[in-house]
Amino acid sequence: QCWIEAPFHCDYGTQITIGDHFFANYDCIFLDVAPIVIGNHVFLGPRVSLYTAGHPLTAQIRNLELEFGKPITIGDSVWIGGDTTVLPGVTIGPETVVAAGSVVTKDLPGGVIAAGNPCRVLRSLSEEDRAFWLAQREAYLQGST
């Protein structure tokens, strides 16, 4: 199951691999000049941008219209908040939460909460986090019956 809200933009579409139970909210952009690999149970907020493309820093070379591509990999069960940009070559580990508005310039390990520009790890997800959200789920289910 894969759900992508319109509008959505990608360069080619042939370099994108998406796992099961994927959701991308409105206005996502995937610049896929290099592979983008997305795991299972991944959620993207509105206006998340995945940029595999980059350009040389020096104007003389950039003016030759050269670009490069580096892959992006997003692990299973990752949630990326809205208005986040993921730059070329980044890997985001499984079960990580990236806060809205972040700019991810470097790899993030699994099981953490990360935020900022540049994005950095704030803390690891804990057993207390898991217990809290399991209790919230139970309360929700009891209230909806």
Cite the ranges covered by each PLM segment.
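Short-chain dehydrogenase/reductase
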Residues: 79, 97, 103, 113-115
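Conserved catalytic segment of ABC-fold P-loop ATPases
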Residues: 93-96, 109-111
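Flexible, glycine/small-residue-enriched loop-and-beta-strand segment within the central core
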Residues: 6-18, 23-91, 117, 123-134
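HATPase_c (GHKL) ATP-binding subdomain of two-component histidine kinases
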Residues: 106, 115, 121
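Short arginine-rich
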Residues: 106-111, 141
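Extracellular beta-strand-rich, repetitive "passenger/adhesive" scaffolds
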Residues: 2-4
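Hydrophobic/aromatic residue at the end of a short beta strand that borders the catalytic acidic motif
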Residues: 92, 104
